[in-house]
Regions:
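Generic N-terminal amphipathic, Lys/Arg-enriched alpha-helix
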Residues: 4-24
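A non-catalytic, amphipathic alpha-helix used as a structural packing/dimerization or gating element
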Residues: 24-35, 206-213, 353
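Active-site-proximal beta-alpha core segment in soluble small-molecule metabolic enzymes
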Residues: 48-193
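Active-site loop/helix belt of alpha/beta enzymes
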Residues: 144, 150-270
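Active-site loop ensemble at the mouth of alpha/beta enzyme cores that anchors a bound cofactor
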Residues: 202, 238-309, 313-315, 319-323
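C-terminal accessory subdomain/extension
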Residues: 286-386
Length: 386
């Protein structure tokens, strides 16, 4: 990667922009998209669904959507719902978490034309479903309802057959205002559990068995709600590689793995390339670190230079120049962060240092634009700022 960062540093210094930038390596992104495309070519049991919060830029979403031939999206933040509906004529949106009922009512009151949009609202309890039912009655609309199920993550959602039957019965009783659209079971725990507690393969099979149990309830006890186009959503980037091999789901949500921030470094995703980087310019170069109140340390031998960079303290790890790291005692800063590099490092003011984000969803909203870097040229893509 050293050659990549050296070239990127030179190209950034020749560009007009000297602010901190969030860089997408276009070549690496293309490789990741090719990997996903190939997997879906053979995983004919699944349809891809893009997680908007993880790819929170309209141009990025359009690029990925076109490459994967999908207009299925998962939205976690309501202000991002309308832009998706407006920019994708065939948008199929599944909410990734239950929304407060006031937001649902506000959305349809402010955007009545969206009544005809393909939106699946996620419901986790009978109480929430009753709230949604009341809104649908007041507005004289029909809401598509997707039920959140607990497949082992234990973050809420239906966790018993009795609860599932209760929700399905309520939907069945109000066909004018509620339409059952499917299930959503997020299984991120599968790859996070220490092997000593449960192996990945075992945890995945257990989560799949739980999912199938709820599907069976629908098909066997509520046949009038069952049809071929129900959305059985699962996954997330961590378990992508498992679902494409075998899954009881027919709809797979993912996003982060395409950019591969460091939280998604795993054995199952090892073939994917990291392609999201923060580039920030060096403001000051000092021969060594000086600590306030400890001038006596200045007389000691120093093996590191001290740099002060533009910004800092992102959810990201410094990766270049080699050996770069925050100072242990000086403290972190979001304004001008001090970092150390080996004394032999050739670096000057206005050079860039590089960091690798741990998440994409936490970092993208902090930058007004994404900088798409391909063939030594840059494109600016607007990001979703909230």
């Amino acid at each position: 990667m050293n050659h990549f960062f050296e070239q990127l540093n030179r190209d950034l210094k020749q560009s007009a922009d000297a602010l901190p930038q969030l860089i997408i390596d276009g070549q690496a992104l293309e490789q990741n998209l090719q990997y996903a495309t190939t997997k879906f070519k053979y995983a004919t049991h699944l349809q891809p669904r893009l997680v908007v919060k993880s790819l929170a830029s309209m141009e990025l979403l359009k690029t990925v959507s076109a490459k994967l031939s999908t207009q299925r999206f998962m939205v976690f933040h309501l202000p991002q719902l309308l832009p998706i509906l407006e920019n994708f004529s065939e948008a199929d949106v599944l909410l990734g978490k239950p929304m407060p009922v006031r937001l649902v009512q506000q959305f349809y009151t402010q955007h009545p034309q969206s009544e005809h949009g393909n939106i699946q609202w996620l419901v986790d309890t009978k109480a929430r479903l009753l709230q949604y039912l009341e809104v649908a009655k007041v507005l004289a609309i029909q809401l598509q309802i997707n039920i959140e199920i607990d497949v082992g993550l234990h973050r809420g959602g239906v966790d018993s057959k009795a609860q599932m039957i209760e929700l399905l019965r309520l939907i069945e009783q109000h066909p004018d205002n509620l339409k059952f659209s499917g299930l959503m079971g997020y299984d991120a725990h599968v790859t996070k559990l220490p092997p000593v507690i449960k192996k990945v393969e075992v945890a995945y099979l257990e989560s799949q068995a739980t999912y199938q149990c709820y599907k069976d309830i629908i098909q066997q006890q509520f046949p009038q709600l069952w049809h071929a186009h129900l959305c059985f959503n699962g996954g997330g980037s961590p378990t992508f590689y498992l679902h494409v091999k075998q899954s009881v789901c027919n709809d797979l949500a993912f996003g982060s793995m395409l950019l591969k921030p460091s939280d998604f470094d795993s054995e199952g995703l090892r073939v994917l390339q990291a392609c999201l980087w923060i580039a920030t310019p060096v403001l000051k170069v000092l021969p060594y670190s000086q600590l306030p109140g400890l001038t006596i340390l200045n007389k000691l031998p120093h093996r590191s230079k001290a740099l002060f960079v533009y910004g800092g303290y992102w959810m990201a790890d410094y990766v270049y120049p080699q050996g770069i790291h925050p100072h242990v005692l000086y403290g972190r800063s979001t304004n001008q962060e001090m970092v150390n590099v080996p004394k032999t490092t050739q670096i000057e003011v206005d050079d860039f240092v590089f960091l690798r984000p741990t998440q994409s969803e936490a970092i993208i909203p902090q930058f007004a634009q994404l900088t798409y870097y391909l063939d030594r040229s840059f494109k600016k893509w607007q990001s979703f700022r909230e």
